[in-house]
Amino acid sequence: MTIPFILASASPARRKLLQTMGIDPIVRHSNFDESQIQLTDTIALVQTLAQCKAEVVANEVNEGLILGCDSLLEVDTQSYGKPESPEEAIIRWQKMRGNSGVLYTGHALIDKTQNKQLLRCGITQVYFADVSDAEIKAYVASGEPLKCAGCFALEGKGGLFVEKLEGCHSNVIGLSLPLLREMLNELGYTVMDFWQ
């Protein structure tokens, strides 16, 4: 029997990461209102948001593994999701350039068959290049940073402005593949169980 693998996210980057590792997930966007959750601890916040997204979708299906994720970038003790405007993105990039931040991705994996749930957080240190005002304006004008937690896409144009990472590369894109493998193993599965 094949167990459905359901991604509780509309993120094309997360879907692509799963497909790269051989899993072609069923995509179900949770439409969860993130403003309902007000926590100051970044790890608790991303894990709670990931859990809420996964639970919304889990309540809509009868079987399968449901993966919810949420990412935030913390720079100088301030947590950032997606910027709300180009102006906000420019201000953020002015703070980020030549600086470093920590990208947190909460992972919630619900196994409907076993009635089990796991919560984890991937943590990656990101070092940003000292980019010019012109580079910031051009990058923001591309529209890419407005779609991403932390205001950059490592797998896109934003990768040009990241000097180095300490930790999991895929975590910065929105899903830690090594962490997911560990979570699957903890539930008694292997990644190969979900290969297409």
From Swiss-Prot:
It holds the Pfam family Maf. Keywords: Cytoplasm, Hydrolase, Nucleotide metabolism. The active site is at residue 70. The keyword Repressor does not apply. Its cofactor is a divalent metal cation. One of its GO terms (biological process) is nucleotide metabolic process. Its main location: cytoplasm. InterPro entries: ITPase-like_fam (IPR029001), Maf-like (IPR003697). One of its GO terms (molecular function) is nucleoside triphosphate diphosphatase activity. One of its GO terms (cellular component) is cytoplasm. It is found in: Cytoplasm. Its EC number is 3.6.1.9. It catalyses: a ribonucleoside 5'-triphosphate + H2O = a ribonucleoside 5'-phosphate + diphosphate + H(+); a 2'-deoxyribonucleoside 5'-triphosphate + H2O = a 2'-deoxyribonucleoside 5'-phosphate + diphosphate + H(+). It is an enzyme of class 3 (hydrolase). Nucleoside triphosphate pyrophosphatase. May have a dual role in cell division arrest and in preventing the incorporation of modified nucleotides into cellular nucleic acids. Belongs to the Maf family. This is Nucleoside triphosphate pyrophosphatase. It comes from Gloeothece citriformis (strain PCC 7424). The lineage of its organism: Bacteria, Bacillati, Cyanobacteriota, Cyanophyceae, Oscillatoriophycideae.
